[in-house]
From Swiss-Prot:
Subcellular location(s) per record: Nucleus
EC number: 2.3.2.27
Functional note: E3 ubiquitin-protein ligase. Participates in CpG methylation-dependent transcriptional regulation and epigenetic transcriptional silencing. Mediates ubiquitination with the E2 ubiquitin-conjugating enzymes UBC11, UBC8 and UBC8 homologs (e.g. UBC10, UBC11, UBC28 and UBC29) but not with UBC27, UBC30, UBC32, UBC34 and UBC36. Promotes methylation-mediated gene silencing leading, for example, to early flowering. Can bind to CpG, CpNpG, and CpNpN DNA motifs, with a strong preference for methylated forms, and with highest affinity for CpG substrate.
Organism for this UniProt entry: Arabidopsis thaliana
PANTHER family in the cross-refs: E3 UBIQUITIN-PROTEIN LIGASE ORTHRUS 1-RELATED, E3 UBIQUITIN-PROTEIN LIGASE UHRF-RELATED
Protein name: E3 ubiquitin-protein ligase ORTHRUS 1
Compositional bias of kind Acidic residues: 580-595
Tissues and organs where the protein is expressed, per its UniProt entry: Expressed in inflorescences and leaves.
Pathway where this protein functions: Protein modification; protein ubiquitination
Ranges annotated as RING-type zinc finger: 129-169, 495-552
Gene Ontology terms describing biological process: negative regulation of gene expression via chromosomal CpG island methylation; protein ubiquitination; vegetative to reproductive phase transition of meristem
Length: 617
């Protein structure tokens, strides 16, 4: 059967003609483009080679008559000759490594060029070593202003005895080649480039739709970006308390900026969104608010698990997970796998270990509890987790994580008529502990405990420090700290004479950096040679020693034609530009926050008070 099209093997070694992965003995590799070809799928005319190395049909430029008809992809002979000539030029370039040759061949075969290199890549190439094409490792600067790795320079100048710059062919003095000095300013430049790269990668281009708290309405609202209407897709309303998301314990009066009373036990809200606005429980769907490395701040009893047992002053709580929520499911009553102490479950166990107080809210959805509110969501104070374990759930197939919560609040519970809060009480008897696995009981003293002297619950140890920046001033301080680090590194590029940022920097053979104007002004009026005479008799001229301002190195030869370090100059200009942009962004933020908000909604004290109605027993 006639083969009309000749195709090579792809990157996985599969022949693009017969779709077979041939063994190595049935393939031929082109000596020019290093592409494997399947021998049985090649025409006999293509197997003939007049030279020692076999060339594929694409590189040989020979058009086989049987492959010409019907092949619209056939390369014209003129373009094929140009392509082959370019590939042979790459192969003959001894300055390139095999990896670089392969990269250039691939770019040439795919039709790519240097136009595809982005601006950031071009900026990186400006500080690359011209020998190894990498960021300079222990960079040194030649008197002509070009930068190299110390290892590459020693291999070039000392190992091969070449005393000319490989870029501009300027002569390299022997004392520079014998004792090259590392350019510390360029080391700082590379370090700063790496810091900038990490920060750019960390802050990837992602659009954040931010609404300042003072511009939010008092109730949850649906934005135009919401997929569906309703509270499930609603954005949160204004936050009325100034606590961070990882705040532990009760919400005190100093964090209630409007009422100055804090969040009281028994306050109720219409739904979880309003509860979120007052900080009692931030997640509007999840039942646990916490972080596995910090602890759990609050939980919600909303009837999500049949295993939960509510006894008011204490209750048994079930962890999260183990249910199939694929297909965009929000809830699923059936357990499909074992729960494990990780993520939110681990945060509850950490709160048990440290003895942190956990805020508890009860929802009207908890139909099986006599202590749940008839409607809405109610804040019932803080509890402490005394024990945690795993056990087979009521569905009888999979293990669930279990937690024993005991109330420890200074305010009385909403269902009691007591005038005082809780007192330390003995732990209840839990029958399922007899078959429990992975039982954990706190051994150290709890962080939140009852003080007998004061007769109240309080922090006996320092509460966990918040990891979430809440104050805008704190955020600006953090941003200024990052910019200060850049400014500190920018000081590395200061002239050793004027102590200002380098302008037209020149690097001496002793690796010190100066402004070109400062260095020339330092030795202005000093000639290279000093004429001497004695009693009217002319003596041999003596060379003037021009000592470096920072060391004892003679710069007389270097000062004959000092070259500006263009790479360093461009780096300094880029850093200056980024500093100016950062300062401008901070000043804009300060101006915006100093102006009155465009939308400021007055809070009605009556409505606020109504949203936090106190329920009696």
């Amino acid at each position: 059967m006639a083969i009309e099209t000749q195709l090579p093997c792809d990157g996985d070694g599969v022949c693009m003609r017969c779709q077979v992965n041939p063994p190595s003995e049935e393939t031929l590799t082109c000596g020019t483009c290093v592409t494997p070809w399947h021998v049985p799928c090649l025409l006999p005319e293509s197997l003939a080679s007049s030279t020692g190395e076999w060339e594929c049909p694409d590189c040989s430029g020979v058009v086989v008559p049987s492959a010409a008809p019907g092949t619209g992809n056939a390369r014209p002979e003129s373009s094929g000759s140009v392509l082959v000539a370019a590939i042979r030029a790459i192969q003959a370039d001894e300055t390139l490594t095999e990896a670089e040759k392969a990269k250039k061949r691939q770019k040439l075969m795919s039709g790519g060029g240097d136009d595809g290199v982005d601006e950031e890549e071009k900026k990186k190439l400006e500080i690359f070593c011209s020998i190894c094409i990498q960021l300079p490792e222990r960079p040194i600067t030649t008197p002509c202003g070009h930068n190299f790795c110390l290892k590459c320079f020693e291999k070039w100048a000392v190992g091969q005895g070449k005393l000319t710059c490989m870029i501009c062919r300027s002569k390299i003095p022997r004392h520079v080649a014998k004792n090259p000095r590392i350019n510390l300013a360029l080391v700082s430049a590379i370090r700063l480039a790496n810091v900038t790269k990490c920060s750019v990668e960390a802050t990837a281009a992602k659009v954040h739709h931010i609404i300042r708290n003072q511009d939010r309405p008092e109730k949850a609202f649906t934005t135009e970006r919401a997929v569906k209407t309703g509270k499930a897709n609603a954005a949160s309303g204004k936050f009325f308390v100034t606590i961070p998301r990882d705040h532990f314990g009760p919400i005190p009066a100093e964090n209630d900026v409007t009422r100055k009373q804090g969040v009281l036990v028994g306050e109720s809200w219409e739904d979880r969104q309003e509860c979120r606005q007052w900080g009692a429980h931030f997640p509007h769907i999840a039942g646990i608010a916490g972080q596995s490395a910090v602890g759990a701040q609050s939980v919600a009893l909303s009837g999500g698990y049949d295993d939960d047992e509510d006894h008011g002053e204490w209750f048994l709580y079930t962890g999260s997970g183990g249910r199939d929520l694929s297909g965009n499911k929000r809830i699923n009553k059936k357990q499909s796998s074992d729960q494990a102490f990780k993520n939110m479950n681990e945060s509850l166990r950490l709160s048990c270990k440290m003895g942190y107080p956990v805020r508890v809210v009860r929802s009207w959805k908890e139909k099986r509890s006599a202590y749940a509110p008839a409607e809405g969501v109610r804040y019932d104070g803080v509890y402490r987790i005394e024990k945690c374990w795993s056990n087979v759930g009521v569905q009888g197939s999979f293990k669930v994580c279990r937690y024993l919560f005991v109330r420890c609040d200074n305010e009385p519970a909403p269902w009691t008529s007591d005038e005082h809060g809780d007192r330390p009480r003995p732990l209840p008897n839990v029958p399922e502990l007899e078959t429990a696995a992975d039982l954990f009981v706190r051994k150290e003293s709890p962080s939140w405990d009852f003080d007998e002297a004061e007769g109240r619950w309080k922090w006996m140890k320092s509460p966990p420090v918040s990891r979430m920046a809440l104050d805008p001033e704190e955020r600006k301080k953090n941003k200024r700290a990052k910019n200060t680090m850049k400014a500190r590194l920018l000081k590395e590029f200061s002239c050793q004479i004027c102590r200002e940022v380098l302008s037209l920097p020149v690097t001496t053979p002793c690796a010190h950096n100066f402004c070109k104007a400062c260095l020339e002004a330092k030795f202005a009026g000093i000639t290279q040679l000093r004429e001497r005479s004695n009693g009217g008799r002319k003596l041999r001229a003596k060379k003037n020693i021009m000592t470096c301002p920072c060391c004892t190195t003679d710069l007389s030869e270097f000062l004959q034609n000092p070259q500006v370090n263009r790479e360093m100059m461009e780096i300094i200009e880029n850093f200056k530009k980024s500093e100016e942009e950062a300062d401008a962004s901070i000043s804009e933020e300060e101006e915006e926050e100093s102006e009155p908000p465009t939308k400021k909604i007055k809070m009605d004290n009556n409505s606020v008070g109504g949203s936090g109605t106190s329920l009696s027993a």
